Amino acid sequence: MLQPKRTKFRKQFKGRIRGEAKGGSDLNFGTYGLKALQPERITARQIEAARRAMTRHMKRQGRVWIRIFPDLPVTSKPVEVRMGKGKGSVDFWACKVKPGRIMFEIDGVSEPVAREALRLAAMKLPIKTRTVVREDW
């Protein structure tokens, strides 16, 4: 699963996801892409599940680009522990995704295969998405 090799700080604030994506809202690598329509935290496990669903449907043909990276450490305290006594340990890694962000890109397969692969990937994610196609080719 994806996670940073090293970080400047071990833990981060929760924060909020406001506004729309400034960058990363256009297709850069592939012909087909999966665009987020809602703000949400996407975990490394969800990214990996979506990637596996796509590559399995594409039968390892074509190419997949993952345009998001889980760089946000999410902490949790153990079960049945009283409040206080500091912040919990890092439980998993996540990525803040804003509306308009391209999360995955595909190239090298036919349009029906690409659309179905992206649909299967979208089912693994907790947000509404849209399949986008590069128009300038």
Swiss-Prot record:
GO molecular function: rRNA binding; structural constituent of ribosome; tRNA binding
Gene Ontology CC annotation, any one: cytosolic large ribosomal subunit
PROSITE patterns, A to Z: RIBOSOMAL_L16_1, RIBOSOMAL_L16_2
Keywords: Ribonucleoprotein, Ribosomal protein, RNA-binding, rRNA-binding, tRNA-binding
Keyword tRNA-binding: yes
Tagged with keyword rRNA-binding: yes
Top-level lineage group: Bacteria
GO terms (BP aspect): translation
PANTHER family in alphabetical order: 50S/60S RIBOSOMAL PROTEIN L16, LARGE RIBOSOMAL SUBUNIT PROTEIN UL16M
UniProt similarity note: Belongs to the universal ribosomal protein uL16 family.
UniProt cross-references to NCBIfam families, sorted A to Z: rplP_bact
Known partners and oligomeric status: Part of the 50S ribosomal subunit.
Protein name, as recorded: Large ribosomal subunit protein uL16
Organism: Dinoroseobacter shibae (strain DSM 16493 / NCIMB 14021 / DFL 12)
Gene: rplP
